[in-house]
Amino acid sequence: MKHVRIFATLLALLVISVTPAVIHSEDVYREVTASGAHNLTLAVDNPRNLGGADDAALARDVAEVLRFDMTLAGPFSVMAPPAGTSPGGIRPGEFDLDSWRNAGVDLLVKSGYTITGDSVTMEFRLYNATQGRELAAKRYTGKRSDLRRITHTFSDDIMQTMTGERGPFTGKIAFVSTESGNKEIYLMDYDGHNVQRLTKNRSINLNPDFSPNGRELAYTSYRRGNPDLFRREIFTGTEAVVSSHRGINVTGTWSPDGKQLALAMSRDGNSEIYAISRDGRDPRRLTTHQAIDVSPAWSPDGKRIAFVSDRLGKPQVFIMNADGSDVRRLTTSGAYNVSPRWSPKGDRLVYCRQEGGFQIYSIATDGTGDTRLTSEGSNEHPRWSPDGRFLTFSSTRDGGEAIYVMRSDGSGQTRVYRSKGKASHPTWSPRW
């Protein structure tokens, strides 16, 4: 019932009023950055009380969430209100926008809250201080406990306004943690808040992967003594076995249409890549080789699958058609390359290379542009955000193993969660 209530709460987030979207959002970006000399300076003003009780903690939390999201976003140099700017209200004409422009601000976020019992209404407004005009205005109503999600939603709206594509900030990250003494699967906001435990089977659970609609997770569990593949409905907790053949049933990943999963199975004595229906029927063997083949990853159009094979002596990343034909090697540098994952745009893959510890690399689908993204500690399990702008991964750089996020070019590496045990195998949900 807890998960049902969570789902109902998410559905209850109601957009009360929405101003028309900016049609030429890329033009807005060009207007503000016409000089090409700097990132956008984005100021987040402190939220104002628009009615009802004061709540300083609420105002602080909203500002912190917005600043964190926009700092990670990258095109923005994020700042608190600079000296000499007009506080005033939040709507056009209620404050001096020129004072913000004169303080070097390109973009300004104003917000306010109204508290009524357990309900809070948040109003957000985005201004182009350089051009002296409003770009977006949104109002949301929800429970006090919904506040972080409401704020992340407006961060997504800012990205939509400025780039033409929504941000990923309302997404969740599923991951594995040993905090309970076992490897269990957990779920959290992308920034490490609102952590909840999903599995409680006191066993080893690995490699969670979100379904395309974000409502299910596929994962491998040893709960019955064999590494079997399960799928779990996130909001109800309902589970079903997908593959329990003798031997391994691991690294399961969903096809883009959600009808199949690709996984590695050893049902025939050797680890090979298979495709199987979501209910476990009709397994189709895709690779036929005496080497070990594991870690399949679908291309976003569903036409190709990347995977790892040691058929040339050491693990390397290969690509094949979704029916198993036309196998070709992708990685040619490094002696040990694993854990590939296709970008949502389909133009690149990320993977891990062993260099003492593991480091994360990004490579184009034709094998060019092989670029190292990490350097500190050992870094594994890279997974893309749904918009392809960011990655989540695990790292040991601060001692232990924790969950991080970064931009897709390797910049902005930020720890978002560190548990009492080890945290690993993160995966970013589709947009909910």
Swiss-Prot record:
Disulfide bonds: none annotated. Pfam families: PD40 (PF07676), TolB_N (PF04052). InterPro entries: 6-blade_b-propeller_TolB-like, PD40, Tol-Pal_TolB, TolB_N. GO terms for cellular component: periplasmic space. It is found in: Periplasm. The keyword 4Fe-4S does not apply. One of its GO terms (biological process) is protein import. The keyword Glycosyltransferase does not apply. Residues 1-21 form the signal peptide. It comes from the Bacteria. Keywords: Cell cycle, Cell division, Periplasm, Signal. Gene3D superfamilies: TolB, C-terminal domain, TolB, N-terminal domain. The Tol-Pal system is composed of five core proteins: the inner membrane proteins TolA, TolQ and TolR, the periplasmic protein TolB and the outer membrane protein Pal. They form a network linking the inner and outer membranes and the peptidoglycan layer. Part of the Tol-Pal system, which plays a role in outer membrane invagination during cell division and is important for maintaining outer membrane integrity. Belongs to the TolB family. This is Tol-Pal system protein TolB. The gene is tolB.
